[in-house]
Amino acid sequence: GLFDIIKNIVSTL
């Protein structure tokens, strides 16, 4: 979902 995308960006950091 949308949160998955946010968590994906945070994981990149």
From Swiss-Prot:
Keywords, in A-Z order: Amphibian defense peptide, Antibiotic, Antimicrobial, Secreted
GO biological process: defense response to Gram-positive bacterium
A single GO cellular-component term on record: extracellular region
Principal location class: secreted
Expression sites by tissue: Expressed by the skin dorsal glands.
Cellular compartments annotated: Secreted
Main function: Weak wide spectrum antimicrobial activity against Gram-positive bacteria.
The protein, known as: Dahlein-1.1
